[in-house]
Amino acid sequence: MDSIHGHYHIQLSNYSAGENLQSATLTEGVIGAHRVKVETALSHSNRQKKLSATIKHNQSSRSMLDRKLTSDGKANQRSSFTFSMIMYRMIHFVLSTRVPAVRESVANYGGNINFKFAQTKGAFLHQIIKHSDTASGVCEALCAHWIWSHAQGQSLFDQLYVGGRKGKFQIDTLYSIKQLQIDGCKADVDQDEVTLDWFKKKGISERMIERHCLLRPVDVTGTTESEGPDQLLNAILDTHGIGYGYKKIYLSGQMSAHAIAAYVNEKSGVTFFDPNFGEFHFSDKEKFRKWFTNSFWENSMYHYPLGVGQRFSVLTFDSKEV
């Protein structure tokens, strides 16, 4: 700035007084213009530096993963952007508006909220929206991991979050959830079979009962469109005389599908997990039935045939740990 002003001031000494006055006015304007340009350039440069510093600060101090790579050296899964990601984000937003109503209703029917979780919003949505095969949701994989964790006497959320509190994700668990969903979405594979294979490796097996002199897995299917959730609830709450059981529940409709899970115990009640709303506990089956029928089924919007309110399938599982 000073060197520019000095340069033009020296040139003025070669002119007469009259010319100097005219030139001085012109020069002052030129100097002013240059000063504005320089100040603008410096201001822009400073803004860029501040923005860059802020981004770096946020990336370092607000990283959502406990470390960059999994224990076996794998990075968090990502894929190229697709426009379907925008559509899924909108669907997640609509579902997320139902979270308050569902959670508030739990206490009204004698239940407790064990953990507030929703794949439809917040930091977890930010993680799954990064890959085209997980952007629509990872309910199947979440339910599988929830059953496995519960069967070990542990909490999925202690394994998913550092310290069991929302904040940083433990990348090993996050990666495992996403990868199970990705594997189930591959062409020429059956997602149910992928999950069953994963369960077997974890010591979780389908419950088998004898039918016509043959052992068959307990797989109850039915409809909910006109009958409501009664048949569905009967299948969820039936422990087949054993007194307990893990349930993986599949709901489907005209345009969508969803998985939820439960652990039913004749003595301790029902622990219910929905990836869209969290983990809830009811001390007995009747409280759970009333809540599910009178509140949850509508508040979740699962009763709409256009969504997931047409058909259901309930699989029962046992664990070596139980």
Curated annotation (Swiss-Prot):
A Gene Ontology biological process term: proteolysis
GO MF annotation: an example: cysteine-type endopeptidase activity
Top-level enzyme category: hydrolase
List of catalytic residues: C139, H258, D274
Span list, region Disordered: 43-72
Keyword set includes Transferase: no
Alphabetically ordered keywords of this record: Hydrolase, Plasmid, Protease, Secreted, Thiol protease, Virulence
Domain of life per record: Bacteria
This protein's GO CC annotations: extracellular region
Keyword Secreted among record annotations: yes
Subcellular location: Secreted
UniProt cross-references to InterPro entries, sorted A to Z: Papain-like_cys_pep_sf, Peptidase_C58, Peptidase_C58_Yopt
Membership in a protein family: Belongs to the peptidase C58 family.
Described function: Cysteine protease, which is translocated into infected cells and plays a central role in pathogenesis by cleaving the C-terminus end of the human small GTPase RhoA/ARHA, a regulator of cytoskeleton. Once cleaved, ARHA loses its lipid modification, and is released from the cell membrane, leading to the subsequent disruption of actin cytoskeleton of the host cell.
Assembly with partners or alone: Interacts with human ARHA.
Name under which the protein is recorded: Cysteine protease YopT
Organism: Yersinia enterocolitica
Gene this protein is translated from: yopT
